[in-house]
């Protein structure tokens, strides 16, 4: 068999990619929640480009259009940020049902599959890899143990919020939002501050 290799990979700063300085194992990226097909797609673009200028394509399409004559001699740049962007495209193109299973298995099946399913519409446009999911959604599964802001002086405020929410009969996002906006106006609190406090008390984070 005849073997061919591309030039040495470089970092975005044009320095040589090194296993002593950079994560070069596929297992590292898989552990971050990068899909194998996204990683393969990105690596295919190292030293080669699609004849139609496409960045996203399947392995089957790659096999069909690849020509060894198109390999470039210039040392390609391996950019983890670009890889994450590409993986994000794969996430957004994936059916919610399949993404639910991916997240469920990535989290070692420790969290409710049904609840994961309900949170996907909230984060699908925001995450770029599966490891991004839990930092955004952990508060759905367990009460925060730490809070980034001290809210102990706002107990009366949250009592008023609680009382207002108890009045809501039709528990829908737009109705809840309208009730909270009206309460903020009644209490003469800016929406930005009002909802920041709400975010912190629910998620523990700013």
Locations of the language-model features?
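Small-residue-rich helix-loop
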Residues: 96-190
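Conserved glycine-rich FAD pyrophosphate-binding loop
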Residues: 181-206
């Amino acid at each position: 068999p005849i073997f061919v290799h591309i030039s040495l990979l470089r970092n975005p700063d044009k320095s040589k990619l090194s296993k002593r300085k950079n994560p070069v194992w596929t297992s590292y990226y898989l552990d971050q929640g990068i899909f194998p097909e996204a990683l393969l797609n990105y690596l295919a673009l190292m030293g080669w480009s699609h004849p139609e200028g496409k960045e996203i394509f399947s392995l089957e399409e790659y096999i069909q259009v690849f020509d060894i004559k198109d390999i470039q001699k210039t040392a390609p740049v391996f950019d983890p940020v670009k890889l994450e962007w590409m993986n994000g495209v794969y996430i957004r193109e994936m059916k919610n049902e399949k993404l639910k299973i991916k997240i469920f298995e990535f989290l070692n099946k420790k969290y409710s599959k049904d609840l994961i399913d309900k949170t996907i519409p909230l984060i699908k446009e925001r995450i770029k890899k599966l490891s991004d999911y839990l930092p955004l959604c952990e508060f759905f599964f367990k009460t925060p143990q730490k809070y980034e802001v001290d809210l102990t002086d706002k107990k009366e405020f949250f009592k008023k919020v609680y009382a207002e929410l108890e009045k809501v009969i039709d528990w829908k996002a737009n109705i809840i939002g309208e009730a909270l906006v009206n309460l903020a106006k009644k209490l003469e609190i800016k929406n930005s501050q009002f909802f920041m406090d709400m975010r912190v008390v629910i998620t523990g984070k700013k």
